[in-house]
């Protein structure tokens, strides 16, 4: 009889723009080869979905576009969307799992899902598997908080994070398993997005918010140092107009475009450009880098241990805060013949191979 695994993410199905909900969906799909899997979500997104009502973070973020609502919510908490999702899902997901027992819980939505899983473990001794996607962001602040739930197995993305975990929780079981990429969806073959830009085209993907860690302004500054290079920005957020004005000022109206597309069309966007970059301050998840490489694109990224491991020989890492160095790295990347190196690098992160490693962990719990 197959083990029953409950994968938890309320936002899955409601939004496809975030890395954690996409991973929850992909993990549910691929773990179903080995186990009886249920994906607990607020909206139907796969044949494995069990729809349980709550207020997912995406719905709160939409409400926050109203300045009055945003002001009211952020007066009391820095991340109201995650808090509201966590509270409302705790009230509905916990009773469900009390009556629909599983053998392993696998929360994917930060402390909200961990709280649900902790109650179920307390009642029924059900082990918890958790993937720490924040890594060393904010000097490990999120990681330290989530360690208080003491998951039966914690999955991290690199050796540095594993060593940090053991420095503060020596008894914690930790496994290193990379995040996956859908190689069937992201590949060089297929339709291309018609962006109409001239010359070599550099792509960046991310939320357009001056307050986040993506640092899109650094890309704009770097491209402004180069001739015959255009910038395609794929994303949405509260500061679209700000970045549009900055691009117009730095690049001119003919050398950039800001577009918003459905997730299903993202592969077409990757195929339409010559290289990819994201100069984020920290990027423990790394989904967009993997998608870009799987699409055949070389990558320019921030120089840190995670991205050196992730990108390998499929691109260039540099000090992106040094605009001259960043611009030179982009120029080198666009003038280099990369052949199949990016695709070969991405092949190590197929969801099939990642799911097999997770399956081995689940069988051991």
Residue positions per predicted region:
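Carbohydrate-associated surface elements
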Residues: 160, 180
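Aromatic "clamp/platform" in nucleotide-sugar-dependent glycosyltransferases that forms part
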Residues: 281
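Short His-centered aromatic/hydrophobic patch
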Residues: 85-86, 107-113
